[in-house]
Each structure stands twice: as structure tokens, then as C-alpha cells.
Amino acid sequence: MVTQLTKNAIDSLINSTNPDEQYVIQVLKAPQSVAENLFKICISDGFCKFKKGYFVSDAATKCQDLKDLCIIKCKKYIDDSNHDKERIIISNYELIYSNIQEQIGKPIEYKQYKSSGFSNPEGSTVIPSQYLSRNAQILQQNQVSQPKQMVTPPVSNINKPTPAVNNTFAQKPAVTNQNIQRVNQNPQQMNKTAPVKQNNNNNNNNNGNNKNNSSLQISTDGDEQNLEYIRNLQPNGQPQTIKVRITKKGDLKSFKEKQGKLFSIDVIDKFGDECSISFFNEIAEQYDGLFKVGQVIVLKQFSVKVNNNHQYNKGDHTVTVNKESKILICQEDPSIPMIKLNRQFIQDMQNKQKGDLIDLIVVVKADTEVKTMILKKDNQQQSKRDIISFDESLIETEITLWGETAKDYDAKQGDIIVFKDAKIGEFKDKKQINIGYGTQIFMNPDEQLFPQIHDVKKWYLSLNSDQLSTIQKAQGNDTGPREVTSFESSLNILKEEIKNLQTDPEMKIWKEIRGQIMYIKDTPLYYNACFSCKKKIARNNEVWTCINCNKDFNEPDSRYILSLNISDSTDTIWVSAFDEVGQKILGVKGDVFRYADEDTEHGTETKKKLLMAAQNKEYRFLLLTKQERDQNGNARDKTVIHAIKDFQPAYEAKKIINSLEKFMVIEENNP
């Protein structure tokens, strides 16, 4: 009997230190499909956790029913230790325990664990004994064998008290990871009929949150006669029946102002018409977890209302499941499309209104590092990442990801992303693309799911440097400032383009430069800021006072305002860098330099060592150059490091290889 996880399994799997060892690990989050036969997982060995784990091959074909916190034995994995990025690729596994309801130990992030000398005082590999005695057998994977299955919630649970749920329903959609659903992109996997949960007759109490879906009744006595199409639904109270495919499933959420719960699914019928189906309160509890994206279902006896909220619901009408409703889970029906994409281009957003939805297929130009933002609404921290992308309209735009999605984003330059139901926003009279409540993101999706991908790839491979140099920033109107952007460039080209600022002072220039830091000015390095508004604050006796927020602090937040000289093989230039980039360059927070300034004995030497250590290092810089005016109205050109990435020789070599391959494709197409 397996009684514990394998200590340091994560590090061993990453470095392939013992290929014959079968490591026991915990899957913290259920596998998430990211491409055909590829599932992403977050795993733990009790001492550290790792987000970039993947199931491929045999593991990918059987992993869809794995639950959060289950324990598996890694039987086969791929030696990927020579790859430039740390990741774990598992090709086969054995399920050990599926009934685990808690995290084993208190694992920390792998990088933190590694930097601390593989030490974590709160880590543990011991599996609690109650799980060993209760269910030591592997749960069998239930496959649907009937052509159709009738799913109805158990009557005995209708009046069951609702367990407490985190109050996330009313939170701002754009900053919650639950708003963005990464949909199964493998058409073969989407075609599979998902198994219905059946009664396992175990005594798990599920910590009081067991929805008891295991007692659902299964029947095959339904039929598909008198089907109605979504476009013909009527809110007349008469019985209606529809046959649809699930294209999106939302999470179970709770209301803010009154007790209650909700989840919804988006569906599509054979004509490509869409609508949203909602489940409320005890009905939501009973059906939550039963559906999977790609399933074909028949729904009978439901309520229909006119859709008055197109921001959250699809179609002209909304459907609500009630106690009399019946749902049949059907076999695959190829006449019903997988998903509907009303593709438009970045330039089309100028003709849309704020709040409108748009479907885009874009090519990644660059992405910034994950940043931490303080939300003004509640002073809570949120992670964000900006994706700079473009399409065939040769216009680029920034699309911002928030929360865990920003942290998990793993695409690179040239990758293709599909945004379904992105939301048109507006900031300072300029249109922008926002990630809304119902936005779906597909990273490098299969061409079978979106046939348009083939044409986009072909177009991207055919681009030459002259065409790339004409890509412009999307603007809110034709009279707005012009922005010039290119992929990889050099400092001598940047300096030539800066001359154009004399005739077009509103222009902004974006360049990605591979260069190194030559010198960092030692004063000023930072300013003392308020923790809330980030504005400059002054010392008042023993406290620091923010006039803007009317708050006092024992210490300030020392934030970088660096001035540094960078160079490449063509030229040098003075640039500015602010706090997040400064921390990346110097490796410490600005507070360290403030402490050094206060240390009259050793402070000067400490500052000198830190600054010297940061010089002569090579990076990839994303630079923004624009013209600014000082208090006297004098114009000056200013270049700021917008983002920075470590120089990776293996990645640079791959870029050269990719460029050669792209050139060969162009040569073949243009003999």
C-alpha cells in the first residue's frame, strides 16, 4: 500500500536523475487541455509544487477524469532535461488514490524550494491514514455505453442546505481567472461522450460539500422527436426540446446580494445558432460537474426568456433548467459544429461600441513579464500580463490577461491565439480589447477546430521584413498619434526613427532590442512612494506621510527610477527604467538601496557592488520612445524600458533556425 509521496520527485523529474524510478506525486489541479493530446497539470511532491507539468501519449488519453488532489504514480516520463525551459512531460501513469480531499504537506513553488537549498520546514510526503483505510482501490473510469442517457437530479437532495461558497459572482470579471475558460481544443476528445457520475457507495462526506451526484438516475427511454431549433425558441411556456453541443461551461458561483448559486453553459445547434442555459440554486448544485465541453445533449421541458443581457448570455433567448427539465447525454453528432467563430480583425474594433463582443485570431508579437497591480477598488494585488499581437490588418494591439491566467500564459513570438467573445473596451477615447466574463482563449488551437488557422499560418510565414515594419498600433480614431512598431531591431535604426519625432511629436516608437547594460547612474536610483497610490511621500518626524491618501507609514515603498546606458552591436542609448524592470535588473527591491543610503559605514560599498553586478549583462529589451515636454515646455525624446527578458542562448539559436526555416518556405513558395 502506498503511504507517502516521493520526496524531491519534482526535481528528479525535471532533471531526469533516475529514469527507472516510479515517482508518487499529487495532482493539485485536474488536467487542462491545451492542445491535441496535450494536457497541462499542476503537481506536488509534498515539499514543492510545479505548474508546468504535461500529460502526453497514453497519459493524455486517459487523464480527463482525474480529479483535483488525486495521487498518481508516474510510470513513464520523457527526459526533457536538455530543454531550455523547465518542464515535466509524463507519458504514462497509474492512479493510486482518487478520494484525497486535501493537499499533502504545504508545498512551495519549485523555484523557491530550489533557491532555499531544497528546504521547506512545512513540507510533508505522508498521506493521511483516513484516506488509506477508506478507499485504497483505484476508481474505475466509467464509460458511457448507452446511446443516450437520461440525467435527472435526485429528489431527495432538492432541499439540501447549500454549502458556503466563496463570494466571487459579483467580482469584477476582468480580473478573475474564472472568467477565462481554456476549452478542450482536441476535436477527437471533444467528440467523446463524457461519463456520468454514478453511485460509488463509499462513505466520503466530501467535507460537507458532496453534491451527491452519484445517485443520479440513468435511463435510455428518451427520444429526439419534435426537436426545435434555437432560432425558433419561444417564451410561451409550452414544452420545447433542443439538441445542442456544449461549447463552454462556467464555474459554480454565488450571488453577492442574496443567497443563491448559478452556473451556465453555452451551446450551439446544427445551424450554428447559440444560446446560454442557466442552472440556479439547488438545480445548479445537482448538475454542476456533469457536463463537459464538446458533449452533445438533448434538453427537454425548460423555461425560455428574452435575452436582455448580451454581455453574459448568448443569443436572442436564454434557457433556464428547472425541476421538470430532462437532459439526455447523446452520442456524437457530426452535424452539430464544434464551436462558432465569427472572426473579425483588429481594425474592425474601431467600428464597434464599448461592450460589444469580437472574435479574433492573432499572432503573438511579444508579451511582457507578469506584473503585480494594486487595484484601486479594493487595494488587492492582481497579476497581469500584456500580449502584444497583430493580424492580417497589419495593426497591433495589447490584450491584457489577469490573475492565474496571466501567470500560466506560455506562448511565444509567432504563436497563434484565438479569442472568442473578447470584449470591446474604451480608455481615454481609444478602443481596446478586454478579456470579459465569457471570453474563451485557445492557445495554438488545432486546425480541425478552427480551419481559419491554416490561412493565418500561411500568411504569417509569407511576411517579409518590409511588411512587418508597417505594422501600426491600433488607435481610437484617425486623428490619434501614430505608433511605429517592429519585431527585432537595432539601436542605429531606432535612432534614425527618433529623428521623425521632430516632425511628428505625437508618434510613439516600439522596438525590441537585444543588448547589454553598459552603465547605471548611481543617483537618483529610487524615490520614496506611498504603498497605495505610488506617489512621492515625505518624511514627517518619525513617520512617512502621503498627502494624496492622507495616510502615515512607518517606512516608504522605495521604487526605482533608473537611468542607464545600453548598447548593441550598432550603437548606444540612454534609457529609463522603473520599479518592476529595475528589480529585474538589480535583483533587489529599492528598499535595499535606501537602507544602504542610511548606512554611513558600509552603504556606499554595498551600492557599488550591486550596481557593478548588474552591468555587462545581456537582455532583450522592449523599448518605447516618445517625445515629452518638461515644465518649461521644452521637448525631449525619452526612451523607456517597457519590459525585459533574460538572454537565453538556446532560445536565440532556435530563433535563427526558425528564421531559416521561414526563409526556406518563402523560397519554396516563390521559386
Curated annotation (Swiss-Prot):
Residues 143-166, 190-219 are annotated as: Disordered. InterPro entries: Euk_RPA1_DBD_C, NA-bd_OB-fold, Rep_factor-A_C, REPA_OB_2. GO terms for molecular function: DNA binding; zinc ion binding. A zinc finger (C4-type) spans 530-549. Keywords: DNA-binding, Metal-binding, Zinc, Zinc-finger. Residues 199-213 have a biased composition (Low complexity). One of its GO terms (cellular component) is DNA replication factor A complex. Residues 240-322 bind DNA. As part of the heterotrimeric replication protein A (RPA) complex, binds and stabilizes single-stranded DNA intermediates, that form during DNA replication or upon DNA stress. It prevents their reannealing and in parallel, recruits and activates different proteins and complexes involved in DNA metabolism. Thereby, it plays an essential role both in DNA replication and the cellular response to DNA damage. In the cellular response to DNA damage, the RPA complex controls DNA repair and DNA damage checkpoint activation. Component of the replication protein A complex (RPA), a heterotrimeric complex composed of RPA1, RPA2/TEB2 and RPA3/TEB3. Belongs to the replication factor A protein 1 family. This is Replication protein A 70 kDa DNA-binding subunit.
